[in-house]
Every structure is written in C-alpha cells, then in structure tokens.
Amino acid sequence: ADTPDELLVGTATGDDAAVWKIDDDRAIVSTADFITPVIDDARTWGRVAAANSVSDVYAMGGRPLFALNLVGWNTESLPTSLLGELLAGGQDVATAAGFAIVGGHTIDDPEPKYGMAVTGEVHPDRILTNAGLKPGQDLILTKPLGVGVITTAIKADVASAEVAAGAIESMTRLNDVGSRIAVAAGATGCTDVTGF
C-alpha cells in the first residue's frame, strides 16, 4: 500500500510513536503503551505506567496533549478501589506533565495491565527518531540502565529499600526536560529505553 505523505514516522523504523503531519508547523504524535505491575503499590504502578507511556511522546521530541487510559483488570479477584488507586497514579503523572486524560477503555483480564494511548504534538522539522541517529554521535542517557533487573529483585523481595526507592524514582520521573534539551541542542535521534 502507498504511504500517505502526511505519515512522517510509521512502522518502518520501529520508533516509539507514529507522527502524522498536520501542516508545516504541526504534527501529531501518537503512541500506546501498557505494562503489567512492576510494584505492589497500585498508585505507584499507575505512575510508572503513565510515565512509561508518555515517555514515547518525549522520545519523539513531542509534547503530550491528552491520553486515554488502557486497562486490563481482573474483576473477579481485584477490588475496584485498587483500580481507583491505579488510575489516580496515572492522573498524578498527567497533572505533572500537563496533559489531560480524556477517557479510556477497560477489559476483563486475568493479568492486570495499565497504560495509555497518548496523543501529542511536535514540529515536523524537529522530530527525533531512531533512524535519525548517526555514527560518531555521542549517546546520552537521561536515566540509568538496569531498572528491569531491579523490578525483578523487588518482586522477589531481595531489593533493598534504598535500591527500590531509586528505581521507583527513576521510573516515575518524566523525560520532558531531557526531550526539550535534546530538541533545543539539535539532537537528530532519540529512543525510549525501557525494559520491564
């Protein structure tokens, strides 16, 4: 099938989000992401999942506008009060990042999942992509690697409180500042490194 001219980033490069050109100054960034619980506290898991979801927009050099909650919930074994805490964690991130949660969808699922479909905007000439990376460029990490190993240790109850707190801080910290700095500095590429 022919690719529309408006599709600036699609599936060909394995990027974090799709980008669709609206006009010479605006393009829409669209992504969806969700995760299974990485921590026992529902509100913290909500914050982690929401920060993870919106990070895809930041990785493209964009700014989030709004999101839809995506929830898989075991209605037979998990109370709705816990779901409320989960969604409150997502709202915490939306408030901090300045985007609206405008709805969503919930399905009955034996394994709980939470995330968001996030829509944002980016200037068509300032999109950061995987394909934009060039040999010889410096690689800058905005967060430490290894959080997936730590979340596994948390689930096995072998991570110290200090290590767990550091991982949670990293997973819930927004990538908005790093994204703005990258765009302002003329970065040509970016990706969201996740490994839950």
Regions found by a protein language model. Give the residues of each.
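Helix-biased detector of long, well-ordered alpha-helical tracts
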Residues: 1-196
